[in-house]
Amino acid sequence: MLNGIFSVEKNTGMLKNNFLITTTILFFSLIAHAQKDAKFSEQMKQEMCNKVKAAAQHAWQGYKQYAWGADDLKPLTKEPKLWYKKSMLMTPIDAFDTFTLLGLTDEAKEAKELILTKLDFNIDNDVQVFEITIRLLAGLITAYELDGNKKFLTLAVDLGNRLMPAFNSPTGMPYRYVHLQTGKTRDGINNPAEIGTLMMEFGKLSKLTGNNKYYNAAKKAIMLVYKKRSQLDLVGEQIDVKTGKWVNSRSHIGAYIDSYYEYLYKSWLLFGDKDFKTAFDTHNKAIKKHLITKTGKGWFMHQVDMNTGKIIGTTYGALEAFYAGLCAFAGDVETGRQIQEANYYMWTRFNIEPEEFNFIADTITSAYYILRPENLESCFYMYRLTGQLKYLWQGKVMVESIIDHCKNDVGFASLKNVQTLEKTNSMESFFFGETLKYAYLIFAPEATLDFKKVVLTTEAHPFKIEKK
């Protein structure tokens, strides 16, 4: 029984709050039950696609007017944001393939022209290898595969070469930061996600150039994390790339670990390398055994010690929501369904999903929402793999709540608090690259994205599957 919902309080104010919470939960539960079999017409799908297109155009117009050539738009102050000393065009690169997918040809043309005329990686700055890889390297590779302009590939190769020194550690696992001009590295305390979530991008670079150095470096790194797994087949949160020893044994599927698991499975799909499939299957079995808490609201994922399996935390949040889609995509639709029930509960329990909440106490532990895509991502996979209409209804609720609560006059703003709905001055590039893309794909015809031909990266950039 969840604390603070069903318990009777003497305090009248608390009683009213509990009544409102219970009423809200019952309301959304009734809606969800009714929507399982409710029709969702082709016209309704098209209307939702049009809403997403309009949202993308609105956000792009704000970027064009107030942040053209910058990394991001600050939507409240209407100012440009730079990640480093010089813009790396985060938003245009993340947005290009989304615009192409949505059929927004004018916007795609504008993003392409900006990238090809202004992008230059000769920057006197050290950068975070993980973020630059998943946003920029992936975006440029997809742009090349979609558009065919060789300058996209030239830029990708240049960036890949500037990032390669990160792998020059005693173990081969990359440092977190590398200087784009000097190759100097720093921060040897890394994590599985930032180590492993380079495989698709660097592997693809090898396939496109014929130079295996990128693939080999990335594979050595991700497989070393796998080799360092515990006897329970789990990995921890932090590892020293100089010694190969774990410095944090906290295990879960959230930040710092999440996309490591994702890339093991997707790298197998992309390249056909069975080593990745073996590693994923080993981990996935352990995750289901040690990390799932089954509740009446769905299956949540908790935190444990990687060595003992002892539960050390019961928080769940926006980032963890990806695992429902990954489970279903990997063939376990039932586990995916149960986790997605928890995901949707988390979204509707509050106005929008919080960054993190304690699913036992049913209270928020981190109240912000930064336009994250993972819940929509899992909703997309669940609908595509099951055809169940309830996922269209879930998608509709989530997309419309983002539009209702996050939209302003020049774009979309993150929320400081999902309960008060106070906005904050951020619209990151992944809103274009992932959130809008998944929002559209939920309702778009299946032919829009063919699972047999492409695999989506963690930043939702579609990579063409390599011929086996």
Task: List each language-model region with its residue ranges.
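Glycan-recognition and catalytic cores of secretory/periplasmic carbohydrate-active enzymes
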Residues: 35-468
